Amino acid sequence: MLIAQLSDPHVRPDGVLYQDVADSNAQFAVAIAELHALDPRPDLVLLSGDLVDKGTPPEYAKLRELLRGLEIPSLVIPGNHDDRDAFRSAFRDHDYLPAAGPMHYAVGTHGAVRIVALDVTLPGLHHGAVDEAGARWLDETLAQEPARPTIVMMHQPPFETGVPYLDLYACRGGQRLAAVVSRHRQVERIVCGHVHRFMLLRFGGTLLCTAPSTTTAIALQLRPEAKPASHLEPPAFLLHHWRPETGLVTHFLPIGAFPGPYPFA
């Protein structure tokens, strides 16, 4: 099973640049085209939050226009830049989304790997949290299929990155989440967005990775006094490849037209 993860496209209204520097809409369209060019194509696309930038209806209308060109099934979760009500309205045809409250869900109909989405967003705030109710829901949901390889998807990552301005807006309650995940050995990966960079660490007895953005990259600055900044690095996405004999292998794919391929000499 091949699962693409696109994150943080920050779609804007037509003609408006993201952060005044990037045409995030055009970049997202290119990312979708890159998915279609893969051979084999992914079986599923995960969209791991911050699908629009300001949470407005015009942005969601533009997002749905762009997603009409996506020929692969997709699963979505909100990020801190999304508005929960507007998000739910925009994706009212996605019947796996709950009608009210946090957008937790589990879907296992697209292939061998089950996707369990944990909504850690807090309306009106940029940091996230795993509360007791969310942890209990996750524990019970994972217990339902203990033998099924599973990806847990959430937006804000539950660890300190070392980038000071990112860590202000991390997901709180990481120890609570780790305690739950460590009880369920079928969790092959926790996948997040939010930080606009690829990061990887061990967490709760499994691997956790964050996806890059399809638009700007948040600057990698590890000094305590560093100020928030973005770079126009090549956008990218992740490709998670499940094979029973191997497990889940995650690939990082920059988006763009690059020279090659060149045969090995």
Predicted features along the sequence, with ranges:
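N-terminal active-site segment of His-dependent metallophosphoesterases
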Residues: M1-K62, P102
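Active-site-proximal beta-strand elements of phosphoester/diester hydrolases
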Residues: M1-P13, A112-L122, I151-M153, T206-P212, ...
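Active-site neighborhood of phospho(di)ester-bond hydrolases with catalytic His/Asp-centered motifs
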Residues: Q5-S7, D43-D50, S74-N80, D119, ...
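Active-site environment of divalent metal-dependent phosphoester hydrolases
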Residues: V11-D14, D53-P58, N80-R88, P123-H126, ...
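Short glycine-enriched, charge-decorated loop/helix-capping segments at active-site entrances
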Residues: L17-D23, D93, G124, V163-A170, ...
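His/acidic metal-ligating clusters that form di-metal
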Residues: V30-L44, H127-L207, H231, A236-L239, ...
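Extended active-site neighborhood of metal-dependent phosphoesterases/phosphodiesterases
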Residues: P57-Q144, P149, R176-Q186, R223-W242
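His/Asp/Glu-enriched short active-site or ligand-binding loop at hydrolase and phosphoryl-transfer sites
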Residues: A211-L222
